[in-house]
Amino acid sequence: MPDRLILLRPDDWHIHLRDGAALSRTVTDAARTFGRAIVMPNLVPPVRNASEAGAYRQRIQAARPADSRFEPLMTLYLTDKTSPEDIRTAKAQGFVHAAKLYPAGATTNSDAGVTRIDNIFPILEAMAEAGLPLLVHGEVTHSEVDVFDREKRFIDENLVRIIEHFPTLKVVFEHITTRDAVQFVETSSSNVGATITAHHLLYNRNHMLVGGIRPHFYCLPILKRRTHQEALLDAATSGNTKFFLGTDSAPHARHAKEAACGCAGCYTAYAAIELYAEAFEQRSALDRLEAFASHHGADFYGIPRNTDHITLIREEWTAPACMTFGEHSLVPLRAGEKLRWRLLEEKM
């Protein structure tokens, strides 16, 4: 196995940066590794139009470390009230790269999301015409559906319909967690891609539940059984261009995670590429990490690949037990544990 990896600088095609004082943490950590990142719009209130996206983009840019060229790629939050004109205006701005479908109530700050897929069919048509990709949080929210089955049900009830009705629409099935999702993406057209997180590659529901509940493994979509984890590893390391890096790094203050009703989300941005390297090394596939992290996503979005490089070295280091997060603190994934790869710090 190699002791050093030189990779074309990767991008993160799904990240939560939050807002306000949190940006000093999240933007710094993301910019350490990534050239660009697709920024999720689920703020309070959400980012619903080009004006709000532009203002949020400026706040992110202001939080970048000195001399950083990190580029936030903005997205819109789809609601039942989104209009085709919102889509056309956003596309024309040049800095909005996608729109996000959150089924109402599916995850953090999704209460303003779409209540019925049919409500946004005119919007999806406008997106297809404008060439604006659709990002999908693929879970149904019916109370009678088991939380471990929500992704499969979303495919059957919603995603199949979307793709059949809008075959020219680019769709990213985000943070996939099941063998069903892998198979769906593999057998769909080239307009359908998927992001995979490091934590879904490295962990399954046993890590979260066996021997005590570990709240910092709790995320949505929730960790699944090991057979699904294995399917994700197969997909990520296969070389299939439909699968690419998206951390879904989602920070919450420590008190909000370690609570009787804790928030969903794992914070991985501080060591994202190191965690992916561990996952790929499990499959003896480090030679395929660069394509997954640095090629496939940019190619899917039709954006030029980065031209600079990063270097990873095989060197153990200990993840911080706690990190500052605005006025609070957060506990990152793998807090206090050893990581096997380390990113050499270089300015972009």
From Swiss-Prot:
Catalysed reactions, as listed in the record: (S)-dihydroorotate + H2O = N-carbamoyl-L-aspartate + H(+)
Binding positions for substrate per the UniProt entry: 16-18, 42, 137, 220, 252, 264
EC assignment: 3.5.2.3
Active site: 248
Keyword Metal-binding among record annotations: yes
Cofactor requirement: Zn(2+)
Broad class of enzyme this protein falls into: hydrolase
Subunit field text: Homodimer.
Protein's name according to its UniProt entry: Dihydroorotase
Source organism per UniProt: Azotobacter vinelandii (strain DJ / ATCC BAA-1303)
